[in-house]
Amino acid sequence: MYKVTLSACGNIDHDENPYDNIVDGIRIDAQIAEVNSIEECQKIVREYIENNCLGGGNWTGGKVFKGSEQVGYISYNGRYWEKGSEYYR
């Protein structure tokens, strides 16, 4: 079982507050999704991004956990970065 964080912030390039979760005047609720595979994590991330009309400057989620350990990160484009890889954060 995996968990992936789903969250957004305002984009400073669009005069939005990057410390708030309001995007285009709409509050975007943070969520944690539980799924069975990395592929499902990637799918739910892209659905969250598309359903909330997020840009790359809004995306703050994507941390992937197995149990209590973070094992990777899913970037805005849906790519999975394994812990220890170049773009893992």
Task: Walk through the language-model features, giving the residues of each.
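Surface-exposed beta-strand edges and their flanking turn/coil or helix-capping segments
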Residues: N17-N21, E47, S85-R89
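Residues in flexible loops and secondary-structure boundaries
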Residues: I12-H14, K43, R79-G84
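Short, mixed-charge low-complexity intrinsically disordered segments
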Residues: E50-R89
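Short aromatic-glycine-(Arg/Gly/Cys) micro-motifs in beta-strand/loop hairpins
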Residues: M1-I28
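A structural detector for beta-sheet-dominated domains
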Residues: T5-C9, A33-N36, F65, S75-N77
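A short, exposed loop/beta-hairpin motif centered on an aromatic-Gly-Thr core
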Residues: G25-E39
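A short, charged, amphipathic alpha-helix used as a generic interaction element across diverse proteins
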Residues: N36-G57
